[in-house]
UniProtKB/Swiss-Prot annotation:
Residue numbers annotated as active site: 64 (proton acceptor)
CDD domains linked: UDG-F1-like
Entry protein name: Uracil-DNA glycosylase 2
Gene Ontology MF terms in the entry: uracil DNA N-glycosylase activity
Function of the protein: Excises uracil residues from the DNA which can arise as a result of misincorporation of dUMP residues by DNA polymerase or due to deamination of cytosine.
GO BP annotations, alphabetical order: base-excision repair, AP site formation via deaminated base removal
EC number(s) reported in the record: 3.2.2.27
SMART domains, sorted: UDG (SM00986), UreE_C (SM00987)
Subcellular location(s) per record: Cytoplasm
Any matching Pfam family: UDG
Length: 224
């Protein structure tokens, strides 16, 4: 039984009993027993544990977890403390510096965002070590699409930050005019210079929240 410890429990309890999810669970059980899989089994749902449904103000969609040792801990783009900052996150920090003059921190631990209502959600929540996208198409996308659809139903305004073609596919799930979405290429070094750098998504997000009477996000990640 999955316990998230907040309002997601009630919202997702039926989903965790759906046939596709039970099949996914069996797949994961075998994968964790026979392969090296990230993140740690107890960290898979950290994004939902740290950001209750009622608190969601911003959603930053990722693809699947980092597949290097010690990196992934259940939140998109975030890495555990003491781990080198991955290139995509370095570009996010650079854009934050240029956009809002945030200092570039010495870590990639994004829990301070999650605790303010930024849901850091990957569309696939697990991955085999060293094999990007290895758990794609096993059922995670059905669950995370459902999560996006539930957030779409919120009365309070939410900003969706969709970076890269995978994330942009989710635009079709966003039908509530109270919300907004900002899109760009992925912050990866392969594409960041083609439109992510200079997108000003962070100031635009805060502007949208403030216009709707919602407290803006403090995007400054403290150095440790």
């Amino acid at each position: 039984m999955i316990k998230l410890g907040n309002d997601w429990d009630e919202l997702l309890k039926n989903e965790f009993n759906q046939p596709y999810y039970l099949t996914l669970r069996q797949f994961l059980k075998k994968e964790y027993q026979t392969k090296k899989v990230f993140p740690d089994m107890y960290d898979i749902f950290n994004a939902l544990k740290h950001t209750a449904y009622k608190d969601v103000k911003v959603v930053i969609l990722g693809q699947d977890p980092y597949h290097g040792p010690g990196q992934a801990h259940g939140l998109s783009f975030s890495v555990q403390q003491g781990v080198q900052i991955p290139p995509s996150l370095q570009n996010i920090y650079l854009e934050l510096h240029n956009d809002l003059n945030c200092e570039i921190p010495n870590n990639g631990y994004l829990i301070p965002w999650a605790d303010q209502g930024v849901l850091l959600l990957n569309t696939v929540l697990t991955v085999r070590a060293g094999q990007a996208n290895s758990h794609r198409g096993q059922g995670w996308e059905i669950l995370t699409n459902h999560i996006i659809e539930i957030i779409n139903q919120k009365e309070e305004p939410v900003v969706f930050l969709l970076w890269g073609s995978n994330a942009k596919e989710k635009l079709q799930l966003l039908t509530n005019p109270k919300h907004t979405a900002f899109t760009s290429v992925h912050p990866s070094p392969l594409s960041a210079s083609r439109g992510f750098m200079g997108c000003k998504h962070f100031s635009k997000t805060n502007q949208f929240l403030e216009q709707n009477g919602v407290k803006p996000i403090d995007w400054q990640i403290p150095s440790i």
